[in-house]
A protein has these predicted regions:
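Active-site nucleotide-donor binding segment shared across nucleotidyl transfer reactions
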Residues: 31-81
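Residue-level detector of alpha-helical secondary structure
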Residues: 35, 84, 88-91, 223, ...
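NAD-dependent ADP-ribosyltransferases
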Residues: 1, 5, 66-68, 84-90
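Metal-dependent nucleotidyltransferase catalytic core
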Residues: 17-34, 73-131
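Proteolytic processing junctions in secreted/extracellular precursors
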Residues: 4-7, 12-14, 252, 256, ...
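Helical scaffold of the NTase/Pol beta-like nucleotidyltransferase catalytic core
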Residues: 2-49
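Structural alpha-beta junctions
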Residues: 36-42, 92-99, 173-180
Length: 275
């Protein structure tokens, strides 16, 4: 069996990546360590994407590991600067020099902390022990952690989290809106004004009347609700094209038009008359 070592690719030296994939069994201990040095609390609902969720009975490492740790971080509880200060304090307590701590663009990528956009990346000892190697932790800051939990869900064996994000965007475009993974549903006709950031509001706007957050959790649940929509094929067309290029099979619509129903009745009647 080949064990994949690659994970997040922020931290690297001239010799190669400084981080690796993390086994699902090591995720909890690693997050416990992060909580200890930062004072933050990350419940499982704040483990974004596939973090800690991949379990496959065949035992293959890739199917039982995550490339990095994605953590839903509430910007109202801690700022990026405060988090960096806490991480820096711990690193210094381990004898790491100031100059070695921060990545500096492309000039220095072998540091321990990388500050970029809405995220802080940290080269984290797996289960708190450097002997286990390191995994990249992505602290993903947001002003709306409830929305981000739903925006950055993992996937299923058939359709991953990226596939789900593409489907959300495809449906939103079909409804004359845009899906922002940071803000929610926005209206391009109103200067990208946010029109919904709660998933129980987003669900019916995208999938139709009666849809709830639970219907948006996976590609499969979204398609199951949406495929009765008369505009199903049009709504998923961009997503479907992307999936077919990736060799993934997409369910057909189950919507039955009036013409379809009439044709079905004629066929049924004809078969009865023949008998």
């Amino acid at each position: 069996m080949t064990i994949l070592k690659e994970g997040g690719n922020i931290f690297k030296s001239e010799q190669g990546p400084l981080t690796q994939r993390i086994a699902t069994k090591d995720v909890q201990a690693s997050i416990n360590f992060i909580e200890k040095i930062t004072g933050l609390v990350y419940d499982e609902e704040d483990w974004l994407g596939t973090t800690g969720k991949k379990n496959d009975p065949d035992g293959e490492f890739e199917k039982n590991s995550s490339g990095d740790l994605d953590l839903n971080t509430d910007a109202s509880k801690i700022s990026k600067e405060q988090l960096i200060a806490k991480l820096t304090s711990w690193l210094k307590s381990k004898g790491i020099d100031d100059e070695a701590i921060m990545n500096k663009g492309r000039k220095k990528t072998d540091g321990w902390i990388h500050n970029a956009g809405d995220q802080v990346h940290f080269r984290t000892p797996i289960a708190g022990n450097s002997k286990n190697g390191y995994v990249q932790t992505d602290f993903m800051f947001t002003n709306n952690p409830e929305f981000q939990r739903g925006a950055k869900r993992g996937g299923t064996p058939q359709f991953g989290g990226t596939d789900r994000a593409i489907l959300l965007s495809s449906i939103a475009r079909g409804r004359g809106l845009k899906f922002s993974p940071k803000f929610g549903l926005v209206d391009p006709a109103q200067g990208d004004e946010v029109v919904a950031s709660n998933w129980n509001d987003i669900a019916p706007m995208l999938l139709g009347k009666g849809a709830k957050e639970s219907d948006t959790i996976t590609v499969e649940t979204m398609l199951a609700f949406l495929k009765k929509d008369p505009n199903y094929e049009e709504l998923i067309a961009p997503w479907k094209e992307t999936m077919e290029k990736a060799g993934k099979q997409v369910p057909e619509s189950t919507f039955e038009s009036l013409a379809d129903k009439q044709l079905s009745r004629i066929v049924t009647l004809a078969s009865v008359l023949v008998k």
